[in-house]
Structure formats: structure tokens, C-alpha cells
Design a protein with these regions (language model features):
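Zinc-dependent deaminase
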Residues: 1-43, 103, 120, 124-188
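Conserved hydrophobic/aromatic pocket- or pore-lining residues that grip, position, or stack substrates
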Residues: 36, 53, 85
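Short loop/turn motifs at secondary-structure junctions and domain boundaries
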Residues: 45-48
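Short beta-strand scaffold segments in enzyme catalytic cores
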Residues: 52-61
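A short, polar/charged loop-to-alpha-helix boundary motif
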Residues: 70-84, 88
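Mobile, glycine- and charge-enriched loop segments
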Residues: 86-111
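Short, thiol/selenol-centered motifs that function as redox-active sites or metal-ligating centers
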Residues: 107-124
């Protein structure tokens, strides 16, 4: 019998499904990022993963998917909040590129994407990226290494039709990292 894995399953914590409200309309950027910060904090408080949250919305503010960081519980380096949100959104709409039919999508994230999630953003099919904390906040408060980005990373996204807005509720997002550190969160 082969010892090679031929299937993979990534799960979000049980508390997440009880937290999300599919009927709610997130009509502004602040409410969308606030959700991701709340998810990140719950993930830390419940000890179910790292201090990051992300969500995909339609342009009019309907929640399509949400994710939290599950790297350590899932033993999977790609189980970042943004990646989880992208994969779940793609599964829900049944398209590998969310916006390929002209519908517009937004990714809100509690922190600036690392190099992995930044790269995935080009192909995920989103039209707008909303960011809470900056990379320097993550690295200063958690000692995580977020990896290299192009010097003009925002310009690279915008050149491909992805609008970027950052520093949305930045202080609140930074608070999640402080709480993670306070609770002895593991660096990975």
C-alpha cells in the first residue's frame, strides 16, 4: 500500500459557521474588514489557528466565503486565511477565477497578504483588496516572516485591475497580534 497522500481536506473551526451571517449585507469597506478582524480575534481566543482572518464579498457586500489561518492545526503551510477564503469562494461559485463571468468580487483581510497570498490574489479573480494591518505590523508584533513583495506591490495589483485600499481599522487589526502574543501564540 502506498504511503503517498492522494487526498487533502482543510477545515475551518466549528465556531466559524455559527459566527457568519449569510443574510447580512456588508455595505462598506470598514464593515468588511471589521468582520475579518473579528474572525482573526476569535481564532486566537479559541486557539484554533493564527491571528488572521479574510473574507470574499460580492461588490454589493454579500458574504461569499470567510477564512481564518489554519496553518498549525492543519499542518499545512498554505492554509492562510486568504487562501482558505479564496478556495471556499471558488468552490461556492464553481469557478477557479471568481470574476471570469464579469461579476465583481472583493477580498477583505485583517492584514496585508504575505508573499504567498499576494501571488494567489492575481489569479483568484478579485477586483478589490481591502487591508487592515500592514506587513510591518505583522512582523513587529508577531515576529512572523511575511516574505518578499515587489517594491511597488500595490502598483502591480492595480496594473492588473485590482484596486487596493489599506489601513482600514489598522489599530484594531494590530490589537489581534498583540493578543496573540499575549496568549503565547506560536511563531511559524
Amino acid at each position: 500500500m502506498s504511503k503517498f497522500a492522494t487526498a487533502l481536506q482543510l477545515d475551518l473551526p466549528d465556531w466559524l459557521r455559527h459566527t457568519l451571517n449569510e443574510d447580512r449585507l456588508y455595505s462598506d469597506d470598514e464593515s468588511r474588514v471589521a468582520l475579518t478582524i473579528d474572525l482573526a480575534l476569535r481564532n486566537v481566543e479559541n486557539a484554533t489557528g493564527g491571528p488572521f482572518g479574510a473574507a470574499v464579498f460580492t461588490a454589493d457586500g454579500r458574504l461569499v466565503s470567510a477564512g481564518v489561518n489554519r496553518v498549525l492545526p492543519q499542518n499545512c503551510s498554505v492554509a492562510h486565511a486568504e487562501m482558505m477564503a479564496y478556495m471556499l469562494a471558488q468552490a461556492r461559485v464553481q469557478r477557479s477565477r471568481l470574476n471570469e463571468n464579469g461579476e465583481r468580487f472583493v477580498l477583505a483581510t485583517s492584514a496585508q497578504p504575505c508573499c504567498q497570498c499576494y501571488g494567489a490574489t492575481f489569479w483568484a479573480g478579485i477586483d478589490e483588496l481591502l487591508i487592515g494591518a500592514r506587513t510591518e505590523d505583522v512582523e513587529e508584533l508577531t515576529e512572523f516572516e511575511e516574505g518578499p513583495l515587489p517594491a511597488d506591490w500595490i502598483g502591480e495589483l492595480e496594473a492588473r485591475g485590482i484596486a487596493v485600499r489599506r489601513d482600514i481599522l489598522r489599530d484594531s487589526a494590530r490589537g489581534v497580534f498583540l493578543r496573540y502574543r499575549e496568549l503565547g501564540g506560536q511563531r511559524y
